[in-house]
Amino acid sequence: MTDLALEEVASTDEGVEVSVRGEIDVASASQLRDFLDRLLDAGSSRIVLDCRKLEFLDSSGIGVLVAARNRLGDAGEIILDSPQPQVRKVLDITGVSSRLSVVP
């Protein structure tokens, strides 16, 4: 298991960019949920997650991402930027890539 590290690397009036490193699984999903809740509570309407160093994503993490997206409604977006092939595959298989913005 690899720990999850979340770091806010850039911020604008509209939203934030977050570096995501490690694994999002049942053990770390609450850490992601708390982090995203803090950003949403602060009024972020656009959250870009830099997923280049995200090594693993399971259904717990997917649930957190979808819940955060639902909380934003039509007023905002969550973008998963540059997920690794194994993470992209999970997003595609589960259909989450149609609910969240996934770039390249």
Give names to the regions the model predicted:
Residues 101-104:
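Short acidic-hydrophobic, aromatic-tinged amphipathic segments that line or gate anion-handling sites
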Residues 1-19:
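Short beta-strand/loop segment at the start of cytosolic alpha/beta domains
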Residues 23-99:
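Amphipathic alpha-helical interaction surfaces in cytosolic regulatory modules
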